[in-house]
Amino acid sequence: MSSFSRNLLRTAGKAKSLPAYSRNAVPSSSRFVQLTAEASRPQQELPASKSEKFKVDLNRDAFKGYNFDVPKLEWETSKDELVDLYSEMVKMRRMEMAADQLYKQKLIRGFCHLAIGQEAVAVGMEAGMKPSDKLITAYRCHPFTVQKGGTIKSVIAELFGREAGISKGKGGSMHMFTPTFFGGNGIVGAQVPVGAGIAFAQQYMNTNDATFAMYGDGASNQGQVFEAYNMAKLWTLPCVFVCENNKYGMGTSAERSSMNTQYYTRGDVIPGLQVNAMDVLAVAAATKHASNFTLGGNGPLLMELVTYRYGGHSLSDPGTTYRTRDEIQTMRSSSDPIQGLKARMLHWGVVEEAELKRIDKAAKEEVDQAVEEAKQSPQPKEETLWTDIYYPGTEPDWMRGRDRTEIHRYR
């Protein structure tokens, strides 16, 4: 044994023991703040027409601001929109549940991160964004892909690695894209400066569109996130930085990894907005307000969406070694975004229970059909390995393959 190793062991023997962390080390009260699914009530008697707009009051705890005027505690909606929001959240959950089962059947391989419990984030953001606004996120991206123009079939087929996949079977779970959705990115936090770059391009081309650059609480301490904040503020970019705070970065609670878990306050001179993201109407209202703010020439905004994932970090994580089953069940029973919207619609008389059951059944049938169609799609042909790497017309003359003797010539 070297002298260095002996000294290290002697030092370790004299050191004070570190505090032990248990699953209950973080008070549940600090975890669950702002996570109630209660939201709102109509400001007026509901119109008879399903398409006619009316306003609902949002819960007084829907928003918190940091050097920022929070949105009004109201959302203008219609019976049709409420039903659509419910239907979309149910379909997103059904899609993710199907992916869970297909993974366990070994029909999906590799990385797979699901968003069960977080449906109000993707659905609510899409309801509040302009169609031309851009969005980029990390690897928990399946619902965003569908909401930004993909299909359930294209997502499932991509998970299978088939030609009908949104990335033609070459991207997998973490790499899905549409014309307004820039992924689906596998490197923790790396998408945030890319999002700032997208916002710069929009500003440069004067498109009057906003970019929503998303990341999780687990990525919030990455240096590149703060570098992106700095450049976006310096250049007054139309960028909304969105921390999707589901309370755990892999198996580490937010309180154990961040000295300040009020993520919406971490932008220094960038204003912040915290949102109850278990309420789809609050998410929609906040997203619309954020887009209008940054497109008004005010520069970036830091928005924190407080949510909760029911499953593990990925399908290789059972999700119960670092939190109790009671904690998960409490969230399911008290703050579920789908059940919360369902209860309000029934209470307001927007829809009958039978209609919601029909929607639930239709969502299951749509996902089941998408799965079967995805299974029929063929595997990508080997020669497609060389395609979709460069923008058409910008390819080099040739590219080296798996070894120096394998050469593919584009021209």
For each feature predicted by the language model, list its residue ranges.
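Alpha-helix boundary/capping residues
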Residues: M89, K106, G128, L159, ...
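Conserved acidic/glycine
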Residues: S2-V121, G311, P318-T321, R325-R411
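A general secondary-structure junction signal
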Residues: Y139, L305-T307, I389
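Glycine-rich ThDP/TPP pyrophosphate-binding loop and its adjacent helix/strand module
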Residues: F181-Q379
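Cofactor-binding active-site loop characterized by glycine-rich and histidine/acidic residues
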Residues: M97-Q101, Q105-W235, S253-N260, Y264, ...
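Short, mixed-charge, low-aromatic patches
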Residues: S40-P47, F54-D57, W75-D84, C112-I116, ...
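Residues that form or immediately flank small-molecule/cofactor binding pockets and catalytic motifs
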Residues: R94, R140, A277
